[in-house]
Amino acid sequence: MAFGTDPTPDGLANPPIDDLMKHADSKYALAIFAAKRARQINSYFTQLNEGLLQNIGPLVEYQNNEKPLSIAFREIDEGLLEETLGEDDANEGN
């Protein structure tokens, strides 16, 4: 193992897309689900700097340089979130 490298890939490669698809009906639903959660996580970090806490922070351990979307995918993979599409989301793809 070379110094300075991480043996497990980050981002969309980890967790694998096949594992993530077990938690959503379609790739579209998974993308919407993860994007909404990533926006919540991003808002949480912004509010944390301002002293406001209106959103729920990450439900998994994370590193400071980790992107909100990667955190959201890991939360989905671990089954910590439940997917529900609203009317707007369900009709958006049509």
Swiss-Prot record:
Q: Which organism is it from?
A: Bifidobacterium longum (strain NCC 2705)
User: What Pfam families does the entry give?
Assistant: RNA_pol_Rpb6 (PF01192)
Protein name listed in UniProt? DNA-directed RNA polymerase subunit omega
NCBIfam families with a match to the protein in the record = rpoZ (TIGR00690)
**Which E.C. number(s) belong to this protein?**
2.7.7.6
- Name the enzyme group at the top EC level: transferase
UniProt superkingdom: Bacteria
Keyword set for this entry?
DNA-directed RNA polymerase, Nucleotidyltransferase, Transcription, Transferase
Q: Does the keyword Transferase apply?
A: yes
**Reaction catalyzed:** RNA(n) + a ribonucleoside 5'-triphosphate = RNA(n+1) + diphosphate
